Amino acid sequence: MKLPDDFVAYLQSELPKCGELSDFPLWFEIWPEEEIEQANKDIQIEQYAPGFYGFAGDGAGEMYAFGPDGGVYALPLIGMEPKVAKPLAASWTEFQSKIVKYG
């Protein structure tokens, strides 16, 4: 899957790759860019949640994925399937706006 351009720009920036969010799910940890494709293969996302593509996690058993509509969703790593996907944001830009900034 081609990652959204705004997400790729974020990955290549000096902005935080982990930290707090202003609301649920409260924490994010973006996977290293060079590991995203393999991580999706390892968790068999195409088999269990077709149309989704993982890019991060919460450190507690849920991952964040881009959905078929370009939105950002939370999916459990155990019991992963499209019907349990929780919408978090309509786009990466909206998700990014939930990252708590310090200083």
Language-model region placement:
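Short acidic-glycine loop/turn motifs at beta-strand connectors
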Residues: 67-70
